[in-house]
């Protein structure tokens, strides 16, 4: 039996219909043989349940009904179908428990930048575990790895001078902590009314209470009583989807900047604390900014004394062909969030960098109050920091951003060569991050029927051919390891093309049935 997981839509019937249709499709292809297979690729840093074909379990009883409350997964999936269980990784590939090999085109969850088998990172973790497996950073006690990592991060970030680094365990925690730091800063300056944060529609900043509130994806808010009332959302800078007829990219950027200013004036500049943005929006569909967008937005927030937070959780450490996304788009942030590639995801760690102006105020305020009363048990965990230090060395020694510049043109051009497909609305990206959006008639206003599950069909076809992609509705996202070889890029492009052709054929069948 094959069970497909439906996409999270506005109502349950849509999801059920889509799952049933996809189930019929995959069964009809004859590609899934033998034991139970399923279609369930968890969608993290985005919020739809995404089908993709999975494995023939060699386990007699499989893993149905396992004990995890699985993130971004519908309850029935855990009960009724087997998860895809990944057992090992090697370079740009992962292997399931049956030994099937997959090209990991999303680098886990945008994070295994150095691939799955970098011995230097394993060695760094092992040596630190033997030497000092844990010590905290409270009360002016800390460890050498945490001090060394903070120093290295401050020297690596060159978009502007930064003052201090605060360590977290994830990007969600980093963005959550940003809100506390900004409030602490403004309270210290006697500006207690500066509490509101402006984020963008379709943004993703995490899944904690505050970071999910900052995120502009409705599925993160539903039934969680979110977003928090101090969070506002402004326009998503997706030119293809939202530009007006005849409007150029620069005109579009100007309109969005004007809308942002109108929102600030409506709420009162004295109430707005910060604006947060990803240099390239990730889980919202891989959306690079339109020309001059960040130039205009930075001018607006600076005009009204509003802090700029750069969420570099996905874009830091070479993803775009620059060490940080801020370098590519000339962003001069007051605060920066990072995680994921910071340790190539080998050990959980995140970090915040704050400007000297902010760190000086925090320093002064903590002296008045007796301490800076924020932190986590694992802030600056020595093993995580040791691995991150080694990862940063590799990024610099191997000049990973330059490697990305060398291979990304073929990655981008190879996939974008399929933009003429009748089922593709847009293919967009920069560096080693890319998104495909399926649409009828090349129009953002003509989505395919949700129950067809076009994105899910494509994901299933990719996985059948040995490649894992991220599916979110009719959006496909890829963000492969930064160490990809030219041959692996060719493999990715080839599988993409074959999967697209099969998806086109299936869509043609669905259209024919609809018209008959």
UniProtKB/Swiss-Prot annotation:
Keywords: Aminotransferase, Mitochondrion, Pyridoxal phosphate, Transferase, Transit peptide. Its main location: mitochondrion. One of its GO terms (cellular component) is mitochondrion. It is found in: Mitochondrion. GO terms for molecular function: 4-aminobutyrate:pyruvate transaminase activity; adenosylmethionine-8-amino-7-oxononanoate transaminase activity; pyridoxal phosphate binding. Optimum pH is 8.0. Pyridoxal 5'-phosphate binds at residues 171-172, 311. Expressed in roots, stems and panicles. It holds the Pfam family Aminotran_3. PROSITE patterns: AA_TRANSFER_CLASS_3. The keyword Transferase applies. Its EC number is 2.6.1.96. It catalyses: 4-aminobutanoate + pyruvate = succinate semialdehyde + L-alanine; 4-aminobutanoate + glyoxylate = succinate semialdehyde + glycine. Optimum temperature is 30 degrees Celsius. The modification N6-(pyridoxal phosphate)lysine is found at residue 340. It comes from the Eukaryota. GO terms for biological process: biotin biosynthetic process; gamma-aminobutyric acid metabolic process. The keyword Transferase applies. Residues 1-47 form a transit peptide. InterPro entries: Aminotrans_3, Aminotrans_3_PPA_site, PyrdxlP-dep_Trfase, PyrdxlP-dep_Trfase_major, PyrdxlP-dep_Trfase_small. Substrate binds at residues 204, 340. Transaminase that degrades gamma-amino butyric acid (GABA) and uses pyruvate as amino-group acceptor, but not 2-oxoglutarate. Not involved in the interaction with blast fungus. Belongs to the class-III pyridoxal-phosphate-dependent aminotransferase family. This is Gamma-aminobutyrate transaminase 1, mitochondrial. The lineage of its organism: Eukaryota, Viridiplantae, Streptophyta, Embryophyta, Tracheophyta.
């Amino acid at each position: 039996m094959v069970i497909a997981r439906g996409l999270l839509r506005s109502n349950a019937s849509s999801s059920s219909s889509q799952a049933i249709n996809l189930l019929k499709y995959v069964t009809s292809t004859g590609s899934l043989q033998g034991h139970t297979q399923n279609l369930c690729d968890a969608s993290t840093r985005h919020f739809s349940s995404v089908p993709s074909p999975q494995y023939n379990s060699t386990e007699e009883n499989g893993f149905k009904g396992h004990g995890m409350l699985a993130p971004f997964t519908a309850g029935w999936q855990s009960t009724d179908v087997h998860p895809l269980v990944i057992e090992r990784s090697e370079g740009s590939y992962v292997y399931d428990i049956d030994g099937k090999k997959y090209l990991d085109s999303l680098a886990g969850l945008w994070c295994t930048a150095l691939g799955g088998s970098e011995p230097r990172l394993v060695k760094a973790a092992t040596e630190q575990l033997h030497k000092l497996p844990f010590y905290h950073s409270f009360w002016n006690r800390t460890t050498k790895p945490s001090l060394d990592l903070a120093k290295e991060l401050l020297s690596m970030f060159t978009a502007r001078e930064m003052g201090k680094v605060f360590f977290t365990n994830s990007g969600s925690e980093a963005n959550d902590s940003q809100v506390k730091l900004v409030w602490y800063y403004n309270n210290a300056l006697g500006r207690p009314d500066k509490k509101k944060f402006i984020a963008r529609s379709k943004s993703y900043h995490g899944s904690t209470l505050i970071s999910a509130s900052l995120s502009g994806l409705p599925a993160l808010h539903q039934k969680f009583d979110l977003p928090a009332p101090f969070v506002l959302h402004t326009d998503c800078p997706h030119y293809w989807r939202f530009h007006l007829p005849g409007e150029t990219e620069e005109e579009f950027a100007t309109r969005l900047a004007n809308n942002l200013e109108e929102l600030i004036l409506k709420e009162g500049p004295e109430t707005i604390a910060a604006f947060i943005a990803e240099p390239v929006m990730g889980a919202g569909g891989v959306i690079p900014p339109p020309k001059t967008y960040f130039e205009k937005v930075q001018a607006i927030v600076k005009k009204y004394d509003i802090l700029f937070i750069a969420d570099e959780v996905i874009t830091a450490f070479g993803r775009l062909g620059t060490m940080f996304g801020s370098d590519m788009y000339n962003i001069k942030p007051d605060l920066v969030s990072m995680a994921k590639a910071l340790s190539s995801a080998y050990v959980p760690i995140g970090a915040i960098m704050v400007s000297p102006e902010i760190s000086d105020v925090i320093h002064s305020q903590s002296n008045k109050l007796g301490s800076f009363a924020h932190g986590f048990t694992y802030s600056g965990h020595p093993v995580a920091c040791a691995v991150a230090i080694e990862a940063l060395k590799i990024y610099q020694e191997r000049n990973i951003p330059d490697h990305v510049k060398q291979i990304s043109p073929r990655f981008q051009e190879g996939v974008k060569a399929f933009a003429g497909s009748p089922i593709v609305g847009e293919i967009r990206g920069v560096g080693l991050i890319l998104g495909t959006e399926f649409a009828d008639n090349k129009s953002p206003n003509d989505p395919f029927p949700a129950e067809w599950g076009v994105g899910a069909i494509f994901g299933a076809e990719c996985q059948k051919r040995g490649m894992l992609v991220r599916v979110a509705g009719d959006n496909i996202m890829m963000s492969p390891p930064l160490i990809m070889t030219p041959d692996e890029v060719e493999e990715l492009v080839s599988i993409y093309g074959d999967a697209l052709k099969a998806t086109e054929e299936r869509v043609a069948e669905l259209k024919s049935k609809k018209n008959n």
